[in-house]
Amino acid sequence: MVQSIERTMKIIRVLISDEKQAWPISDLASATGLPISTLHRFLDSMIQYGLVEQEPVTKHYKAGYTWMEIGFTLHNRINFRYVARPIMEELAQEVEESIFLSVPAGYDSIPIEKVESPLKIRIDENMGERIPLTIGAPNKAILAHWKPEEVRKVVAAQLAPALQQPFLDQLAHVKETGYAISCGEKTEGTVAVAAPIFSYGNQIVAALSINAPSFRVTEDRMSFLIERVKQKAATVSAKIGGV
């Protein structure tokens, strides 16, 4: 296993070097010190996973775009939480409510960052708690931008048949308007307003939400909260390479 990893890394390091855009198999063998028969075996497996591409005409090899996707994903996971934090603090001061950052985790979401409301009566959530994706505004903001086939799997797993189409209709509205609202879905007496956060390639990576006691959210204030959470989510998206 260790030897296979070492050989794979040798191949990748050569393919991503600045020396050539694409490599003939003979040059790749010289650069890696690996036999051509071994190279063919490794390259065939790597092509299946998009880690390597073979040019159709020349048959030369180059690094695949999967590496770019992996790099962007890792970059976002490492950095976007820290990018979001000061923006969340600004939002908490503007609206005087608790602000949360949630990320998808399988068919659930996990709150990974929060800024508490400066007011005495405020909403709290447990960081790291798994919440089913069909519950709450942040999750609707995330799920509305998943691929339809994945959405159907989540909905089928978490909702009774009679509830599935109404929920899908909600998601369509969320995607169209750019925000989601929930009232007491997770915690009675609370309201949440959320907007999606996107990274490179318009990939949904998180949701930003405002959570408030329902008695503080009038119709006029709801419009204000929607406008602010959408604007701040868009700011985070822009800073991590999204739309």
Language model region names:
Residues 58-154:
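Amphipathic alpha-helical effector-binding/dimerization core
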Residues 84-91, 153-195, 234, 238-239:
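Short, basic/aromatic recognition patches
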